């Protein structure tokens, strides 16, 4: 005669595994949500976030870039192209500053190499395009990005200053 395992039969007939699963499901059903409804809700960004590139200006309106070409030299993807000419006062300024965003790997080396904080990676990460040509940024577009995001860029650089 075989011995019957009553605990195993009780678990089977009382649907214990089912109720354990239902309890777990109800626990997560009423718990706070871990995800955001992205297009309508946005999460916080770190001050060190590396998004869309921008060229900055001084408060008097003059461009910060001194055409040292350190960012071009340090770029591992070779995404930056700079041409410069001397000005009447003897300083150099860029005549061409292009970034090929299809090559850029968002490493931040250009931002770290810049001695005057001219090139920065701003807080904007929503810059999808319909054509590849729109991802070739010229100097005018980079300066426009800098003007658009200057307040937030300056605040982020100030918050990051103790760690530089």
Swiss-Prot record:
GO terms for molecular function: 4 iron, 4 sulfur cluster binding; iron ion binding; NADH:ubiquinone reductase (non-electrogenic) activity; quinone binding. GO terms for cellular component: plasma membrane. [4Fe-4S] cluster 2 binds at residues 75, 104, 107, 110. [4Fe-4S] cluster 1 binds at residues 65, 68, 71, 114. Coiled coil: none annotated. It is an enzyme of class 7 (translocase). It is a peripheral membrane protein. Keywords: 4Fe-4S, Cell inner membrane, Cell membrane, Iron, Iron-sulfur, Membrane, Metal-binding, NAD, Quinone, Repeat, Translocase, Ubiquinone. It catalyses: a quinone + NADH + 5 H(+)(in) = a quinol + NAD(+) + 4 H(+)(out). Binds 2 [4Fe-4S] clusters per subunit. InterPro entries: 4Fe4S_Fe-S-bd (IPR017896), 4Fe4S_Fe_S_CS (IPR017900), NADH_quinone_OxRdtase_chainI (IPR010226). It is found in: Cell inner membrane. Its EC number is 7.1.1.-. Belongs to the complex I 23 kDa subunit family. NDH-1 is composed of 14 different subunits. Subunits NuoA, H, J, K, L, M, N constitute the membrane sector of the complex. NDH-1 shuttles electrons from NADH, via FMN and iron-sulfur (Fe-S) centers, to quinones in the respiratory chain. The immediate electron acceptor for the enzyme in this species is believed to be ubiquinone. Couples the redox reaction to proton translocation (for every two electrons transferred, four hydrogen ions are translocated across the cytoplasmic membrane), and thus conserves the redox energy in a proton gradient. This is NADH-quinone oxidoreductase subunit I. It comes from Roseobacter denitrificans (strain ATCC 33942 / OCh 114). The gene is nuoI.
